[in-house]
Swiss-Prot record:
Its main location: cytoplasm. The H2A.Z-interacting domain (ZID) mediates a direct interaction with H2A.Z/H2AZ1. The modification Phosphoserine is found at S8. Residues 123-161 form the LRRCT domain. The gene is anp32e. It is found in: Cytoplasm; Nucleus. This is Acidic leucine-rich nuclear phosphoprotein 32 family member E.
Amino acid sequence: MEMKKRISLELRNRTPAEVAELVVDNCRSSDGEIEGLTDDFKELEFLSMVNVGLTSLAKLPSLPKLRKLELSDNNISGTLETLAEKCANLTYLNLSGNKIKELSTLEALQNLKNLKSLDLFNCEITTLEDYRESIFELLPQVTYLDGFDAEDNEAPDSEADDDDDDEDGDEGAGQLGEYEEEEEEDEEGSEGGEVGLSYLMKEDIQDEEDDDDYVEEEEEEGGEEEADVRGEKRKREAEDEGEDDDEDDD
């Protein structure tokens, strides 16, 4: 998909001025140039154009609020001065996997006074002797190079991410409290349910016992009735025999 069309789709019924984050990774640039991105994206803070075939940043529009820029896995070898001109507030820049070979190419980044983190993984420049020391000397404003500072301490999350985490933590705590309350209610409900179930089971057992007693009573009554019937039958047979004897005597 062409970059211009991809950007249009990513708007999702928003105006460019409403977009703070834009990701157009793996689309196709036109002749290695940026297209479809305009000055109207004035609120853009995060832009990712990974593996889009860029060779130049010359057509990058003015993005005064842009703080994070992902440009890894492209074919950029220069024109980095555009970044200082168009994205003065940039704090994080990822140029990993590009065609950057010389320290002189990075001199243009000296004017990015707010740049704190720079990634150059898989760029030829990383094979130079004293590469890290040279970058920190060339760009003193940079604190983290390829994820580590000059003392080999790993970069922490950004302040923005920390703020987001704090907010998420507060929300999470509230949600956890609600969850615990619901869980307690569920436990109480479960206990009540167990009592009710136990009670019902006892009732069912009692009903079954009553039914058994009723059946036994019916059987006993049936047995008594059968005994009465048999008694009556024997009585009638005895009377009949008596009558027969009287007739014989006559």
